[in-house]
């Protein structure tokens, strides 16, 4: 399909010929009429290794060459987006340059930041994580050089011919021979869109892909195209989506054995030296092997188990065993992977990702721990923090938000956590391995994934420990890639829909006018009932705020001509607002008076505005990486969850509280405006999206004392209206997430009054003035500890005296004591244990509200656990323990002597056995 889409005037004008590859059967375009292959590996081998196809360029030189070229050709250069895709709610990491403009620009909802534009966008893809270092070409992080044009029905920028022409011209500008370039046809499908595309080949290497996004799933009058069994139809917006691999262009310009040698020459040298293997790259035999390895890798799919097949092919070519080859080049491959991974981490941590067990934080920790595992094998001189810092310096510290000192602290803490994981992981894996071995089963992949996901235990460690236990595990070569794929996209659980079944009815209603935005200080209004069904009232306008953004709905009442109804919930469906009422019936067309619960509304406004202030204060105290993970506002108290790499200390909490209240006392105005999404993102950055990504071309921007967010809630008119902000507590709810609970305004005053009341009551109990309470409590506590020590000393002395006074009877040469003693259960256990350690048997009991009984046995014939169970049953209770020591009790104290007698008989019977 789409064959006609490739019949470009540019191809005809430049003398291109459309041919079919003799190896793969794909169509391609070439200036060389004698050519029979498409130019793509594996149809042809890499020919650029040792024979560069472009003039030599460093990474910086190639990036500037590309961006400058497109600037000269009418494109606007824009700055890169962060690698944490916080403007998206479906993916965590930026995986392509077009992801910068999805979903709103590509859907035509908002205009692009420039048109046409050019960008060099760092991207992170972890789906080939296991191949990095081993294939010679795979990377976790790469820069996608791109130029994009967004064509609309009213404005044509450029399309296919100009895109291919620009590609030709750029490749020629960096020294490429255009007669060696091929354009391979390859229809593109992704994310509900499709279109023709061409892959650009030279020297056996794909250096760019030119995608012409012009088809979508939305049905039109056009008959459509069948692609992979689905129908696609022409879109109104036609998008030029190009991607040139910066690192691949540099590799092809240098002809190095691997992409790592071309892109990271200084870092490869440093890590080789730190690992103590720098001499290997000085060996020409190794260089040849690495180049051959990369060539063969280009000829095959090396994912999964095929990595071993790659080893076999290279080993056969140089006539050594795969095992010997593995020993030779594995250390170098691990160095390559370490270099790649540390650049990936430089971008992740520099762009304020906090390692954790969720979202993008999970992926950061995945890369950190994989890097640490490889570094630990070398016992390197450099630390992980050292290497990441160096990568950040190479990229440019000005390219990152995060301070290097914070990055180092984050990394050092992750190193400590990893060491703890390894220490405790051995016992966990041993238990699992023994379980499967006992069942004569292999340890399945699902179990290994659970051990990694739940406990952080690396698969290599699992494999080694399982082998020692005699268990076999199923561990694929691409384990880390599978894990990364599992966690690369947001998996949202659908919230219960309160209005399920009403969609069609609501869609026919006009939008509700939102008075709560226009008149947030009002509490009464008049409106007309547009519709009423199933206890839901729809009005033409409303002051009632619907639940959303972590803010609960307003409550209140609606008064009609004949009845008054209580509004207990308010929800928004599209642009229509539904009021759930109880205790009344409203009629369509009826005019009603609405009354908001004033105290609740204003308390929610104060708490919502205070949430903004606390977030800003937390950033000021803890660092720029602070990002909201969740929030819930309430009239009495609220909470905000933030991403932070360690527990918040009491001192930090005090500083946050002071900073927040300073902002309140400054009485700065709260500014609310409606702004174009694209312009707002460019001006304020993606920290706008603290509470999620709202839809639409415009954003409601709320500015509160330095905090700027896209927010739909109700807010105070100035920070001074909030009143006091009091932090109630901080809680570590999960790794990398801290929860701050707080109260604002009157609620904060109520809380402080409550604390004062507790303090005053405590002072009354101790008969001291309130200001003398702390030293008095300290003195009492110190005295209590001294008295506790004295009591323990006296108790120990009582035990010693009791032991001295006891006269055991001898049964078969074994000293036996059966006695009631009025001591605490702890002392009973101590006495019984002391006697059993001398080879005797002691059954001791003490009365009280419930009877307590203990049996300690120094003779294997007397099983304490068995006997104590029977005795406790006599007392109406339960007991148990081990053969050497058991205890218990029961409420029937009057049967204590009976229990002791039965116990004595059981002991004697046991000791009389041979």
Curated annotation (Swiss-Prot):
GO molecular function: alanine-tRNA ligase activity; aminoacyl-tRNA deacylase activity; ATP binding; tRNA binding; zinc ion binding
Entry GO terms, CC: cytoplasm
Keyword list, A-Z: Aminoacyl-tRNA synthetase, ATP-binding, Cytoplasm, Ligase, Metal-binding, Nucleotide-binding, Protein biosynthesis, RNA-binding, tRNA-binding, Zinc
GO term, biological process aspect, one: alanyl-tRNA aminoacylation
Top EC group: ligase
Taxonomy, superkingdom: Archaea
Keyword Cell inner membrane part of the UniProt annotation: no
EC number in record: 6.1.1.7
Function, in words: Catalyzes the attachment of alanine to tRNA(Ala) in a two-step reaction: alanine is first activated by ATP to form Ala-AMP and then transferred to the acceptor end of tRNA(Ala). Also edits incorrectly charged Ser-tRNA(Ala) and Gly-tRNA(Ala) via its editing domain.
Protein name: Alanine--tRNA ligase
Gene: alaS
């Amino acid at each position: 399909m789409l064959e006609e889409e490739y019949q470009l005037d540019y191809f005809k004008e430049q003398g291109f010929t459309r041919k079919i590859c003799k190896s793969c059967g794909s169509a391609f375009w070439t200036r060389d009429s004698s050519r029979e292959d498409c130019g793509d590996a594996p149809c042809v081998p890499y020919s650029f290794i040792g024979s560069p196809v472009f003039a030599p360029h460093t990474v910086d030189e190639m990036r500037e060459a590309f961006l400058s070229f497109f600037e000269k050709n009418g494109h606007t250069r824009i700055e890169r987006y962060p690698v944490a895709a916080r403007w998206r709610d479906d993916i965590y990491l930026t995986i392509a340059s077009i992801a910068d403009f999805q979903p709103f620009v590509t859907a035509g909802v908002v205009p692009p930041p420039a048109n046409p534009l050019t960008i060099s966008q760092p991207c992170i893809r972890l789906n080939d994580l296991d191949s990095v270092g081993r294939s010679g070409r795979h990377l976790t992080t790469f820069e996608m050089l791109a130029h994009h044009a967004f064509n609309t029905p009213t404005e044509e920028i450029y399309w296919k011919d100009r895109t291919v022409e620009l590609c030709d011209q750029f490749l020629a500008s960096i020294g490429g021979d255009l007669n060696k370039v091929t354009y391979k046809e390859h229809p593109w499908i992704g994310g509900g869109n499709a279109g023709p595309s061409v892959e650009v080949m030279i020297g056996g290497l794909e250096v760019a892909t030119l995608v012409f996004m012009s088809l979508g799933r939305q049905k039109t009058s056009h008959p459509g195209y069948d692609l992979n069994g689905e129908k696609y139809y022409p879109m109104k917006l036609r998008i030029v989506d190009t991607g040139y691999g910066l690192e691949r262009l540099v590799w092809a310009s240098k002809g190095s054995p691997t992409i790592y040698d071309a892109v990271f020459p200084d870092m490869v040298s440093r890590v080789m030296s730190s690992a103590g293997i720098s001499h290997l790259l000085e060996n020409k035999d190794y260089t040849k092997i690495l180049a051959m390895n990369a060539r063969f890798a280009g000829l095959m799919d090396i994912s999964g188990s095929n990595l071993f097949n790659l080893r076999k092919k290279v080993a056969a070519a140089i006539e050594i065993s795969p095992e010997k080859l593995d020993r030779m080049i594995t250390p170098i491959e691990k160095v390559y992977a370490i270099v790649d991974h540390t650049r990936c981490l430089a971008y992740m941590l520099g762009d304020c990702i906090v390692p954790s067990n969720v979202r993008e934080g999970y992926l950061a920790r995945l890369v950190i721990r994989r890097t640490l595992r490889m570094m630990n094998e070398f016992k390197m001189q450099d630390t992980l923090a050292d290497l990441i810092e160096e990568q950040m310096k190479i990229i440019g510290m000005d390219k990152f938000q995060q301070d290097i000192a914070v990055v180092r602290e984050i990394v050092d803490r992750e190193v400590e956590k990893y060491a703890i994981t390894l220490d405790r992981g051995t016992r966990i894996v041993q238990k699992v391995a023994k379980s499967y071995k006992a069942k004569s089963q292999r340890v399945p992949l699902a179990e290994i994934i659970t051990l990694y996901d739940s406990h952080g235990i690396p698969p290599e460690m699992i494999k080694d420990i399982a082998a020692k236990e005699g268990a076999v595990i199923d561990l694929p070569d691409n384990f880390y890639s599978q894990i990364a794929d599992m966690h690369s996209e947001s998996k949202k659980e659908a919230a219960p829909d309160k209005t399920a079944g009403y969609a069609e009815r609501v869609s026919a209603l006009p939008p509700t006018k939102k008075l709560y935005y226009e008149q947030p200080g009002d509490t009464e209004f008049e409106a007309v009932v547009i519709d009423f069904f199933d206890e839901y009232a729809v009005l033409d306008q409303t002051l009632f705020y619907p639940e959303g953004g972590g803010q609960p709905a307003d409550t209140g009442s609606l008064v009609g001509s004949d009845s008054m109804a209580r509004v207990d919930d308010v929800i928004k469906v599209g642009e229509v607002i539904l009021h759930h009422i109880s205790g009344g019936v409203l009629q369509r067309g009826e005019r009603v008076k609405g009354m908001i619960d004033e105290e609740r509304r204003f308390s929610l406004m104060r708490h919502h505005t205070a949430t903004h202030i606390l977030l800003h204060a937390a950033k000021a105290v803890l660092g720029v990486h602070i990002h909201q993970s969740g929030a819930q506002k309430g009239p009495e108290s609220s909470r905000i969850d933030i991403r932070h790499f360690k527990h918040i200390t009491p001192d930090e909490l005090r500083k946050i509280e002071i900073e927040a209240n300073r902002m309140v006392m400054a009485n700065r105005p709260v500014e609310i405006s409606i702004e174009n999404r694209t312009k707002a993102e460019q001006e304020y950055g993606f920290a706008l999206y603290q509470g999620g990504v709202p839809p639409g071309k415009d954003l409601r921007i709320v500015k509160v004392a330095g905090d700027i967010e896209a927010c739909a809630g109700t807010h105070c008119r100035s920070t001074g209206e909030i009143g006091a902000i009091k932090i109630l507590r901080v809680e570590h709810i999960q790794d990398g997430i801290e929860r701050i609970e707080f109260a604002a305004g009157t609620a904060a005053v109520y809380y402080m009054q409550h604390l004062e009341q507790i303090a005053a009551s405590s002072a009354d109990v101790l008969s001291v003035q309130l200001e003398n309470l702390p030293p008095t409590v300290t003195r009492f506590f110190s005295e209590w500890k001294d008295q506790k020590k004295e009591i323990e000393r006296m108790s120990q002395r009582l035990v010693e005296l009791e032991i001295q006074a006891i006269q055991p009877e001898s049964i078969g040469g074994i000293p036996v004591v059966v006695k009631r003693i009025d001591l605490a259960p702890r002392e009973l256990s101590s006495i019984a244990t002391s006697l059993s350690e001398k080879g005797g048997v002691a059954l001791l009991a003490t009365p009280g509200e419930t009877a307590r009984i203990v049996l300690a046995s120094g003779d294997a014939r007397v099983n304490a656990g068995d006997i104590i169970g029977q005795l406790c049953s006599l007392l109406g209770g339960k007991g148990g323990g081990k053969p050497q020591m058991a205890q218990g009790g029961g409420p029937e104290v009057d049967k204590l002597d009976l229990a002791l007698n039965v116990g004595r008989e059981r002991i004697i019977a046991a000791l009389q056995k041979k």
